[in-house]
Structures are given as C-alpha cells and as structure tokens.
A protein has these predicted regions:
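Short, surface-exposed "cap/lid" segments of acyl-processing enzymes
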Residues: 59-112
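Alpha/beta-hydrolase-fold enzymes
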Residues: 144-245
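Catalytic active-site module of serine/aspartate enzymes centered on a nucleophile-bearing elbow/loop
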Residues: 308, 315-357
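Conserved alpha/beta-hydrolase "acid-adjacent" motif
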Residues: 280-286
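Catalytic histidine neighborhood in serine/cysteine hydrolases
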Residues: 294-313
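Alpha/beta-hydrolase active-site loop
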Residues: 117-137
C-alpha cells in the first residue's frame, strides 16, 4: 500500500506520539542533530501579489546552482521555524540559494501589511513574485517551491501560479511539500472529534487570535475588536475575519475554493508530496482521494508512508543507514534528494537536446 519505506524509532511509530515529540521535544535540540551551520541570511522585503509586502531572508552560496523558496505552517514566524531552518542549512550546504519568508499575516510580514491569509488563493502568486525578485538578486534558476502543513498547501498554489504567472526568463521547475493541508473542511471536522485534535485546534485558534490582535495593534482600522473576540476557533477566525474580504459567503465555500486536493489535477510542473497515513491532524479519508489524484497526474510524485505523524518524520538509525542519510531529518533528505534527481534529469535532457542540434 505504501509507496516508500520509512521507519521511525519504535517509540515514535504512532502519529500522535510523533507529532507531540516533534512539537515539544525535537525543537529543543535540533541544532545538535544537524551537521551544517546556519547560512548568512540577508533580510529582504519582497513585493508579493496585489503589491503586498512580504518579509523574507535570502542566502546565496558561492557557485549556487538553483534556488529553493519556502515557508511554514498555519501559525508562527520565521525566526521560530526551526524545521524550516534545517532545510535552509541543508540546502545551502548542497549549493542551493535559499529564500525563506513570513507568509501573509505572519511574523514581520504582519507588521508590514494588514492583509490577512487566503490559504493559497493569493499566496501562490506571492511565491512567484518572490522568485522573480530573488532572481534579480542573483538567485539562480531553476526555482523550487516548498512548505509544510498549511505552508505545503501554499507552495502547491505557488506551483500552479508559476505555470500561469512566471516570467519567461525565470525557470520555476516545480515544488516539494511535506504533510500539506489538502482539505480544510474535512480535516477541521475530523480534528475536533477526538481529544488530541481538540487540544491542537484550541492551541492553533489561540495563536490565530494573538495574530489578529497583533495586526490590530499596528493597523487598528483593519478589523473590528468585536470580531477578533468572537474568533475562538480556526473556523471562527476565517468566518469572522477572512472570508468577507475574499468575497466568500461561507467558510465552507472558502475551503472548497482554496482546497489543495482540488488543485492537484491542475498542477503541470513536477511536484513531490510527502504524506503520512498516521497524520493525526488530517482526516484519513483524504488519503484515497490523494492517491487517485496522484495517479491521474503524471507530474505528481506521491510518497505515502505508514508512519511520520504531522511534519515529524524523525528516522531511526536503521532508516538513516538504509538511505545513507547524514541525520534523522528523513523528510527534508527525501525532498532534497528528489529535487536533485529532477534537476539532474533536466540537465541531462538539456544536454541531449543540444547534442541533437
């Protein structure tokens, strides 16, 4: 059934345990579990879609050969995103220019603009515009988009937007995502049906409310305090603060329009999706639909694993030895391996084309 062999340590062979471990313990000593130093990033304010300012960081290694653009999940800010920083370290060490950014209404981007989230509907263009500016700064093509959790959904929208909006002189090659949100309606409904899910949903909702108050403090005219007070759930946040600005009558309509699952048939660039069957944040009923979508679209490579939790994928020593990985970060190792393979194939195909001329 599973398309890829991945094995975590025995005590993490449970989605809830893996997710909890990653959130509460792995973040404490992640730097000791990486072999590469932090790149020297330069802060940049990009201009995203609709002129929205986006805060980001850029690092370009000597003799960079291509670029990875990435962001994170539903809450947080760039400096807190240790999992994304692991990617930055690993990618930079392998010769990739790295662009990481606070997406709409998050981190320093929230200080630059009161523009709220749209779960990919507009963030997709943000990815493209960021790549366009990064290219002018010296980041080389091809560009690859990445993200995890809700950030994975945003990156998928970026891959879709690239096919429609990318300038011809910039090669946006595709994307690779980890545990992307694919169906918010089904997953939120599922999440609140069990104790762990209720706890996670409550924590996320509190962070979203903090985010709203942060924006209100800088842009008091941007939203009503009463609406923020009523936003006591993820659904409530979108209902009270988001959907009207985007022109949706209901949250369900909004989730349908931004659905990553509905987007998959429309992707026309190589896309890797890592997805764990035991992810406790997403409705398991999504998996058969994901498999069908991946089977029907030859541009999608699906790595569906039995274990992994939600954005966990800590590998056992046996698993590390099997893949000759330098560390326990199985998901990022597979992402970079897949991108490198895709990049090499494009170089080889390009050389063959030239030899025929």
């Amino acid at each position: 059934m599973y398309k890829y062999e991945y094995l975590p340590p025995y005590f993490l062979q449970n989605g809830v345990t893996m997710t909890t471990y990653t959130a509460l313990w792995a973040n404490r000593d992640w730097e000791s579990k990486t072999t590469h130093p932090e790149p020297e990033y330069h802060e940049v304010i990009f201009t995203g879609g609709q002129g929205v300012p986006i805060f980001g960081k850029v690092a370009i290694p000597p003799n960079a050969h291509s670029t990875i653009v990435g962001t994170y999940g539903i809450t947080g800010e760039l400096d807190q995103q240790w999992f994304l920083r692991i990617l930055g370290r690993k990618a930079y060490a392998q010769g990739y220019a790295v662009v990481l950014f606070d997406w709409r209404a998050h981190g320093k981007t929230a200080e630059l603009s009161p523009t709220l989230t749209s779960d990919g509907l507009y963030e997709g263009e943000d990815f493209v515009r960021i790549a366009e500016t990064a290219a002018k700064m010296g980041c080389p093509s091809p560009f690859w988009f990445t993200g995890y959790s809700l950030g994975g959904q945003l990156a998928l929208w970026g891959v879709k937007a690239a096919a429609d909006l990318a300038p011809k002189d910039i090669n946006i090659a595709g994307g690779a995502v980890i545990c992307p949100s694919l169906d918010s309606f089904r997953s939120l409904t599922y999440l609140v049906t069990h104790p762990f899910g209720k706890y996670i949903e409550s924590r996320i909702a509190k962070e979203l409310k903090k985010l709203a108050w942060k924006i209100h403090a800088v842009y008091p005219e941007s939203m009503q305090p009463e609406a923020i007070e009523r936003a006591n759930s993820i659904w409530g946040f979108d209902e009270e603060l988001v959907i009207a600005r985007l022109g949706f009558a209901t949250v369900a309509d909004y989730y349908q329009a931004s659905s990553g699952l509905e987007l998959l048939p429309k992707l026309s660039k190589p896309t890797l999706i890592l997805y764990a069957a035991d992810d406790p944040l997403f409705d398991p009923a999504i998996i058969p639909d994901l498999e069908v979508a991946a089977t029907k679209n030859p541009d999608i490579d699906l790595l569906l694993t039995r274990y992994g939790g939600h954005v966990g994928y800590v590998s056992s020593k046996k698993c590390q030895n099997q893949y000759e990985d330098p560390d326990q970060w199985w998901a990022w190792n597979r992402v970079l391996e897949w991108i490198e393979t895709s990049r090499s194939q494009k170089i080889e195909n390009g050389s063959m084309q030239k030899s025929k001329v």
